[in-house]
Amino acid sequence: MRVFFFGGKGGVGKTTASSAFAVKLSEQGKKVLLLSTDPAHSLSDVFNTELQGETKLSENLTVKEIDLNEELKEYRSRVFKLAEATLRKETLRELEGIIHSLEESPGIEDVVIFEALSKEVVYRENEYDYIVVDTAPTGHTLGLLKTVRNLGNFLEEIVKLKEKVYELKKLSGKSVHEEALEYLKERKERFKKFSEIIYDKSYFFAVLTPEKLPFEETKRLVNSLKHYGIRVKALIINKVLPENPQDEFLKARKEVEKKFLKEIENYFMDIEKISIPYQKEEVVGYEKLKEFSKFLPLG
């Protein structure tokens, strides 16, 4: 099993590219799970289908949009369940206020998405040949990478917490809450396995358009991916204009585009580049995605 991540600036077509890639793999007879961590839930739009939870779109393709709100509720419930096994009621009330504050703090989305994505990838590794992940815009993707990178410290804290649970229960004379301890153990092993998959079985497609802002954001993204040791499979340069447009406006746009195509080529010399022409029509629906997928490589 391999995992392919698609990321980039909002509006460059990463959801279209990731969906078309998943369709292409599934049409080759591979079992594919397409996941979206983007709160915008764009998969429903691109497939022109109302996705309810997990949806099987063909014999080989399953699609799921991770619901951040639902995952946050489950995450909160788990934390309280663990806390109930170790803390007094007065402390629990204080903890409840702290958790509600944390839900609105920066970075909580990255933690919750990491939790949800780790379950999908680790638990279902043997069900699929490929898992394709349509990520949220670049900032969220980098937050996820930082979470993976800091995994060692996080796991160490979990182990310490487990030891404290034992000590608290011994002091109070109560029996250890097995469910809480099992949850800590499961989480530790799952995060470790997810980290291994990210570094050993994952590849990243960076999607951009030949313009200044997407180019600059892609530079930051690719440099961060290299810093974290994640392999960049290719750059997908989307919405490339025809070579010799007749319209004066398009001619001017083409000159700007040529400049950034050259900059992309020079800056990312060691990375494969895939150029996709600007499409005449919106790429919406399974058949359109299948047609669009001819521009993309196989896994």
From Swiss-Prot:
Superkingdom of this protein's organism = Bacteria
Where are the annotated coiled coils located?
Answer: none
Q: What is its EC number?
A: 7.3.2.7
**Which residues are recorded as binding ATP?**
G8, K9, G10, G11, V12, G13, K14, T15
GO molecular function annotation: ATP binding; ATP hydrolysis activity; ATPase-coupled arsenite transmembrane transporter activity
Question: What keywords is this UniProt entry annotated with?
Answer: Arsenical resistance, ATP-binding, Nucleotide-binding, Translocase
Q: Which InterPro entries match?
A: Anion-transp_ATPase-like_dom (IPR025723), ATPase_ArsA/GET3 (IPR016300), P-loop_NTPase (IPR027417)
The keyword Transferase appears for this protein: no
The UniProt entry, under Pfam families, shows: ArsA_ATPase
Q: Which reaction does it catalyse?
A: arsenite(in) + ATP + H2O = arsenite(out) + ADP + phosphate + H(+)
Role, per record: Anion-transporting ATPase. Catalyzes the extrusion of arsenite.
Q: Which family does the record assign?
A: Belongs to the arsA ATPase family.
Q: What name goes with this protein?
A: Putative arsenical pump-driving ATPase 2
